[in-house]
Regions:
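Extracytoplasmic/periplasmic substrate-recognition and gating elements
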Residues: 64-66, 71, 139, 239, ...
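A structural signal for short loop-to-beta-strand junctions that line the ligand-binding cleft
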Residues: 86, 94-95, 120-160, 316-319, ...
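Hinge/lid segment of periplasmic solute-binding proteins
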Residues: 99-152, 170, 176, 192, ...
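Mature extracytoplasmic/periplasmic domains
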Residues: 34-36, 51, 290-294, 325-398, ...
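C-terminal capping/gating helix-and-loop segments adjacent to ligand/active sites or protein-protein/ligand interfaces
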Residues: 6, 72-73, 136, 320-321, ...
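Glycine-centered hinge/linker elements that transmit conformational signals in sensory
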Residues: 178-180, 225-267
Length: 437
């Protein structure tokens, strides 16, 4: 979107917000004595740390005065969803709340969707990153995307340079070819230095998200909206051999933990992948942009860098997985009009830029993503955000268990890979049916 288009969209949003605030009574024009007009108090819940965002959320918008107050409350990620359910049941929930994609469908009944008459599909798509398209439902927009936390490839610079490897791999094929150089074994055959943590579930951080990323790289959306609700696409398409593309993906994932394969680099006896990387014994770690400072704090002496995730050779698309943090409005808000106005103002470039700086992860608008920061880490994060996608996971905890069983059953040969996928698909289908009502 060029500068002129950006200005037009900003003007449109400004007039929309102005109308919302006048209608709600936040901007009380021509009726100073009317005490029944909405107070403009807006309560926001989210898991973003208060130390980095509270002041910004509460004080950065025009009109933040005694008649218009915003309060941000940080919630524990482990209890956030349950707290939302209990609060809404008592009519004590927030007016606005911030969700990652794996919480949207579970909370769909609480969300007020922004109608396309207020913010058209075209304007939404021209304003926000491609991956935000999952927020566009048939009957409106779930909410406004604020930040994206993309998956990236962290790599140990010393381990690569020791083997004469100048650049990190750009494709999975290139990664395969490096296993002979980067995997080191003891005399008894145990792995002392690993190339990458793939092929297991229990000790691979973000295993479900990595599998999701591989699916997205194959251009499979995982879940899509239909006329009857949301449907699973795990088994969409067939290969020349008659199997699902997802079967090939799972087999690819498992090769890294198969001792009979040249790519063997990981097994269940090894430490957690994050711990292995920060101890200097893992060449590549697939993690989130938000893990950067944690890596630095655990091992300040670790010589590492970051780049985009390897892609599938021959595909005409580039994808990584990302957590898109979205601010949504509650159907039960007693101050819905004001809440919607506040949420839309949080899409202003100045606000999103500062929020991105505070959190050290990328914003979601095309205009801001096109202006990469000078910091090399953040520049890679912005590159990754541009290709970042996600899916509307109907139940994060349930699907995590289902994916774990799928991988564990395949490794133990309790089920073939195809059978394990069939079982997982059926289980997720049942969850989606409940979600669809």
């Amino acid at each position: 979107m060029n500068n002129f288009q950006t200005i037009l969209v900003s003007i449109f949003l400004a007039f929309f917000v102005f109308g919302v605030l006048v209608f709600s009574g936040v901007l009380n024009i021509g009726n100073k004595s009317n005490k029944s007009i909405a107070t403009g108090k807006v309560l926001i819940w989210g898991t973003l740390p208060s130390s980095q965002v509270k002041e910004l959320f509460e004080t950065s918008l025009p009109g933040s005065n005694q008649s218009f107050t915003i309060k941000y409350v940080e919630e524990d990620p482990n209890t956030y969803e349950q707290n939302l359910i209990e609060a809404f049941a008592k009519d004590q929930g927030p007016d606005l709340f911030i969700l990652s994609p794996d919480m949207i469908l579970e909370n769909n009944s609480f969300i007020f969707k922004v109608p396309y008459t207020s913010f058209s599909k075209k304007n939404f798509q021209s304003t926000f990153m491609d991956g935000a398209d999952i927020l566009m439902a048939k009957d409106g927009i779930f909410g406004y995307p604020l930040l994206d936390d993309p998956m990236v490839l962290y790599y140990n610079k010393n381990l690569l340079s020791n083997e004469g490897i100048v650049y990190p791999p750009k494709t999975w094929d290139e990664l395969f070819s490096l296993s002979g150089q980067l995997v080191k074994k003891n005399k008894d055959g145990t792995i002392n230095q690993a190339m990458i943590a793939l092929g297991q579930y229990g000790n691979v951080n973000h295993a479900k998200d990595i599998l999701s990323m591989l699916l997205l790289q194959s251009n499979n959306p995982i879940v899509k909206e239909t006329d009857t609700g949301y449907a699973l696409t795990l088994k969409d398409g067939t290969t020349s051999g008659g199997s699902y593309p997802f079967e090939q993906i799972v087999n690819f994932f498992l090769e890294f933990s198969s001792p009979s394969k040249d790519s063997y680099t990981w097994n269940r006896s090894l430490p957690n992948s994050f711990d292995m990387f920060t101890s200097g014994k893992l060449a590549f770690y697939i993690g989130y942009a938000s893990e950067l400072f944690k890596i630095e704090s655990v091992n300040p002496n670790l010589s590492f860098d970051v780049t985009t995730i390897p892609q599938t050779k021959g595909m005409n698309i580039s994808r990584t997985y990302g957590n898109i943090y979205t601010i949504v409005a509650s159907k039960k808000s007693k101050n819905l009009t004001s809440a919607l106005g506040v949420a839309s103002m949080y899409t202003a470039p100045d606000f999103l830029k500062q929020l991105s700086i505070n959190m050290s992860i990328p914003p979601t608008t095309r205009t801001l993503l096109s202006s990469k920061p000078e910091d090399p880490y953040l520049s890679s994060f912005f590159d990754s955000a541009i290709i970042s996608h996600s899916w509307l996971d109907p139940s994060n905890s349930d699907t995590n268990s289902i994916f774990k069983d799928m991988i564990d059953n395949s490794i133990s040969n309790k089920l073939s890979v195809g059978e394990a996928i069939d079982k997982a698909s059926s289980q997720i289908d049942l969850i989606l049916q409940k979600t669809n009502g």
